[in-house]
């Protein structure tokens, strides 16, 4: 690990507390950021991370505690004061002016002018082009922001921070909406910033990013710091145990049981230009992971199996019965359930209650005398909420008020209420905190113990390796590898995702007759 280049931290928060009315959001906020160090800030939702960051950024003022910048006590009354002291926050969804150029966004409110007050656009463009080049990105100062990806917009925010001479960068879930290549580019930029002695606070739920990028970790729980130490001294299990406050025998509680009969069989699924000749089986009591890079066709295969997207050819069988393609209602009746990738847009009606969302797939069962029984609806929501450890006080509260992890549990409960034989779950833990991840993994393990067949689409390799009995890897619309749990590792999976041979070719799967 790179040693600190300063005798004092670049930024230090000591014993900070903050209350909102009777709610104590932060009781013991301690943090020290050193020059040239990437420091992870971890904790479940509600642990106090957001409050701590807002104190650093000047959005909130602490009730008690001390803030020091380069060893000098400071108190930021506004975000502008924090910015002037060299602090910048990069949010996962940047706030830029789409109809202005990159240069105009970076210099908004502080454009250089000549002696008679005219804006010096050439000087702006030269400086911004230099900043972008120093970050190693292919962007131009005169490009409009409209149409740029979230990843490119984050780069603009970083360049803006550097133009303001920021020496502390706070990155709040910066990779949540990025593809794998975009994440790698962001990591390369962060490493360049380290070389310039910038102190970086990196907030994430993805533990693989913590181990890949950071040198030090602070873990928060219930508004207080519970750990501060070197990343190299930690592993996944120890981080999770510190975050949730209890020992976990394993983060991935996959039950070892022999697989049963084939529950889902697909043969020769093809959608021209999207995927071709997809064939595989998923058995009762088995989790099969579908891995691959973004754009490989994984989610499209899942949507086609469920009947949302069309097929040009191929067969789908559920528990020995052939499924009529292109009809989601028939898929549900046959025993298929799909938890989609984007729970907020595709899995929930955010303005409706938790109870209504949890019962939406089985409302027909809850109708009495032509009206939906709200009592039955609430009972159903409480039943699945208890089983999935849903943290929600009032089932009548809008589901949009829940954390990401609890929203995912509602979507899962909604589909489990249909009594499926096969569960397809797309990115099961995207955007949820580590404690909620452990609970989702526990729920999946319980379903598998009860004999359910699970097809899990995931971009998180630790999740794939920890939960799957077999790993199917897709590359450019085809299955490039079928890897047993005992043979699976990150190198094999990534190699297959990139189209490289992994040692064992995919074996042809025989066609089905009238029964599986």
UniProtKB/Swiss-Prot annotation:
EC number: 7.5.2.7
Membrane-spanning parts: none
ABC transporter domain boundaries: 11-247, 260-501
Top-level taxon of origin: Bacteria
Reaction(s) the record says it catalyses: D-ribose(out) + ATP + H2O = D-ribose(in) + ADP + phosphate + H(+)
Membrane topology label: Peripheral membrane protein
Keywords per UniProt: ATP-binding, Cell inner membrane, Cell membrane, Membrane, Nucleotide-binding, Repeat, Sugar transport, Translocase, Transport
The keyword Translocase is annotated on this UniProt entry: yes
GO cellular component: plasma membrane
GO molecular function: ABC-type D-ribose transporter activity; ATP binding; ATP hydrolysis activity
Keyword Manganese set for record: no
Main location: membrane
Assembly and oligomerization: The complex is composed of an ATP-binding protein (RbsA), two transmembrane proteins (RbsC) and a solute-binding protein (RbsB).
General function of this protein: Part of the ABC transporter complex RbsABC involved in ribose import. Responsible for energy coupling to the transport system.
UniProt similarity note: Belongs to the ABC transporter superfamily. Ribose importer (TC 3.A.1.2.1) family.
Protein name: Ribose import ATP-binding protein RbsA
